[in-house]
Amino acid sequence: MKKIVLAYSGGLDTSVILKWLQENYNCEVVVFTADIGQEDDMSVIQKKAAALNVKEIFIEDLKEEFVRDFVFPMFRANTIYEGYYLLGTSIARPLIAKRQIEIAHLTGADAVAHGATGKGNDQVRFEFGYYCCDPNIKVIAPWRQWELTSRHSLIEYARKNNINVPLDKVNEPPYSIDANLLHISYEGKSLEDPYVEPDYTMLSRSLTPELASSIPEYIEITFEQGDPIAINDISLSPANLLHQLNKIGGKHGIGIVDIVENRYIGIKSRGIYETPGGTILLHAHRAIESITLDRESAHLKDEIMPKYAKLIYNGYWWTTERKMLQSLIDKSQEKVNGTVRIKLYKGSVIVVGRKSNNSLYSYNLASFDSESQGYDHKDAEGFIKVNSLRLKKS
């Protein structure tokens, strides 16, 4: 191998991997860090890489691209995996993989490497992304190759090589954490027992509902063709809008979930997720769709959503079938315009109003107090008779 591009977070795992690659492949290692809203100090990450004698360091602000081209398209589908998971980690991997391959081409590297473990989904997501973008790229997955088979052995290797081991608030190695502008996830340690209540002091973006404000807050979100464009009539870029919703939702205890999910490779995994802004967006988007989509379009979207979510979760973002579904979803959003009013209170997102110039809602048809033109109550009798025929024969 001539040169390797490593997806580098600056954390314990990828710092150890960087050292291990240098020792075992005897070639130049380029590091790439995607700033997608994880709120790490990028200058510290650069110094860590430089201290390990890395000559080419790419640290790129991809927050706007991440939200505009990945998060928002996913939210047009009201995407949710297994009833709870808003796919915060899953949706970040295609962008990182794409840019990693682009940097490999730019620097003349013939291989890429990642820090995903051999038990997780991310190894699949990264490598599917690599091969979609460059079928001939060589892939190095250290967790499937080296003899460091546990967190303990990883920490020992780090200490022997003078690599800093971060500690949490109680002076222990922290949870396995993944963060971006959409969410923060926590795995490992005591969470591996699914019956143990989490220590919520781990949370960094949200207050728990018990500690959240006792005063409800009302906000309005404006949508244009299915994408949010403004909060309280203030237009914001995609990344800034999601960042602002995270701040608002976090102080009201919105979007904290405790999940046991089914990984693609067949293992069940427990995690704690903070997704305040995304949780608000999901409720708001469904609300604006409720008055702008006709019944059959809305029901069709609900039918295909689990398939779409599964494709993203399993790493198939760049595939033809995902793009086909995206085209259908995007077509449905052409008239999803308007404003949703929401009340936030102690972990709850309560839709209290919605309006749109494209609304299909008719007050005269819906009201119990008005006579509707074009609808006669007696018409329902024939409708019921025809649709009950098969029931009478069963």
Swiss-Prot record:
This protein's pathway reads: Amino-acid biosynthesis; L-arginine biosynthesis; L-arginine from L-ornithine and carbamoyl phosphate: step 2/3
Q: Which residues bind L-aspartate?
A: T117, N121, D122
Enumerate the UniProt keywords alphabetically.
Amino-acid biosynthesis, Arginine biosynthesis, ATP-binding, Cytoplasm, Ligase, Nucleotide-binding
Top-level taxon in the UniProt lineage: Bacteria
A Pfam family cross-referenced in the UniProt record is: Arginosuc_synth
Per its UniProt record, what SUPFAM superfamilies does this chain match?
Adenine nucleotide alpha hydrolases-like, Argininosuccinate synthetase, C-terminal domain
An example GO CC term for this entry is: cytoplasm
Query: What main location does UniProt list?
Result: cytoplasm
Compartment(s) where it occurs, according to its Swiss-Prot or TrEMBL record: Cytoplasm
The family database entries (CDD domains) matched by this protein are listed as: ASS
Q: Name one GO molecular function term.
A: argininosuccinate synthase activity
Q: Which amino acids does the record list as binding L-citrulline?
A: Y85, S90, N121, R125, S176, S185, E261, Y273
The entry describes its oligomerization and partners as: Homotetramer.
Q: What is this protein called?
A: Argininosuccinate synthase
**Organism per entry:** Ehrlichia ruminantium (strain Welgevonden)
Q: Which gene encodes it?
A: argG
